[in-house]
Amino acid sequence: MKILEQRIKKDGRVLGKDVLKVDSFLNHQVDPELMQAMGEEFATIFSDEKIDKIVTVESSGIAPAVFAGLALHVPVVFARKNKSLTLPENVWTADVYSFTKQTTNHIMIDHRFLSAAENILIIDDFLANGQAVEGLLKIANDANANVVGVGVVIEKTFQKGRQILDERGVRVESLARIKGFENDEVIFL
């Protein structure tokens, strides 16, 4: 998606050899017009699938997931990273390691919001090592839901996430695919 690649080149910041900071439009401050364009792009890409619900992980996956849900006219559910007093005991769970934060999160989705035979589209902000998506796949599997695909805003192809999902036979569609970083510049595929 050219508009996203241009925005990454303009406002993304490379930190070290494998971290891209996009907090000015995706991970801290959100550009709603860009999110709308991405949501519409996901809707076009997955127009051949019957989708009942979109699933993501809080918090950076929420904005692109909501705009994809708006474009597809389906609800969005996000896995919580922390159990609140209002969350019931009946939840689907998975442990997800965060490469960026160097912590493991115990993500959860209320049983009421994910059911057997629902067709699920997973949307996430980044695909790097694939941990967040793996956690959501586990939750969907535990709920006997059908994952029709994974939509990723930014994929770091030099990390193993895509390979893991390909080996599992999961359809993955990315809006921007990064080959690597050179001299603090993003190199796209």
Curated annotation (Swiss-Prot):
Q: Which reaction does it catalyse?
A: XMP + diphosphate = xanthine + 5-phospho-alpha-D-ribose 1-diphosphate
Q: Where does 5-phospho-alpha-D-ribose 1-diphosphate bind?
A: A128, N129, G130, Q131, A132
Q: Which pathway is it part of?
A: Purine metabolism; XMP biosynthesis via salvage pathway; XMP from xanthine: step 1/1
Instruction: Tell me the GO molecular function terms.
Output: xanthine phosphoribosyltransferase activity
Extract the Gene3D superfamilies matched here.
3.40.50.2020
- GO cellular component terms, semicolon-separated: cytoplasm
Give compartment(s): Cytoplasm
The protein's matches in CDD domains, at most eight in alphabetical order, are given as:
PRTases_typeI
> Which UniProt keyword terms apply here?
Cytoplasm, Glycosyltransferase, Purine salvage, Transferase
Source organism superkingdom: Bacteria
> Matching NCBIfam families, A to Z?
PRK09219.1, XPRTase
Subunit and partners = Homodimer.
Family label = Belongs to the purine/pyrimidine phosphoribosyltransferase family. Xpt subfamily.
What is the protein's name according to its record? Xanthine phosphoribosyltransferase
